[in-house]
Regions:
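Active-site scaffold of zinc-dependent metalloenzymes
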Residues: 3-33
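A structural signal for well-ordered alpha-helical segments within the folded catalytic domains
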Residues: 16, 34, 47-50, 79, ...
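Membrane-interface extramembranous regions at the lipid-water interface
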Residues: 30, 34-39, 43, 91-93
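Metalloprotease/metallohydrolase-associated module, dominated by Zn2+-dependent proteases
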Residues: 2-13, 53-110
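Catalytic Zn2+-binding segment of zinc metalloproteases
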Residues: 40-55
Length: 110
């Protein structure tokens, strides 16, 4: 289910997945198939980690990478879940091909 909340987002962020919802900044973004695919990849990640462990892992990885990079945005870009989603967002068939726990291989540079 896709929801729209214009005032929910910080700076340039436009989408967020909170299982089972995709939350967008603007109604027109519903037509952005690449963004929707990116967020669907996150929904799959959340589902396979049984939701709560996903968020714990995501925040922990972001904190560790923030310490490593000393840059919170670079840390965000390098979270394994984000790497997988960004790397595969243009492949609209990715979720049909994706193997279980695929995000693991993105813990290290791809």
């Amino acid at each position: 289910m896709i929801l729209v909340f214009k005032h929910f987002f910080y700076k340039n962020y436009v989408g967020l997945s909170l299982w089972p919802f995709i939350i967008l900044k603007d109604n027109t973004l519903k037509e952005d198939i690449v963004l929707i695919n990116h967020e669907k990849i996150h929904l799959k990640q959340q589902q396979e980690l049984l939701i709560l462990p996903f968020y714990i892992w995501y925040i922990t990885e972001w904190l560790l990478r923030s310490l490593f990079y000393l840059d919170s945005y670079k840390a965000y870009q390098n979270i394994s879940f984000e790497r997988e989603a960004y790397y595969n967002e243009n492949n609209l068939d990715y979720l049909n091909q994706r193997k279980f726990f695929s995000f693991i291989k993105y813990l290290w540079r791809y």
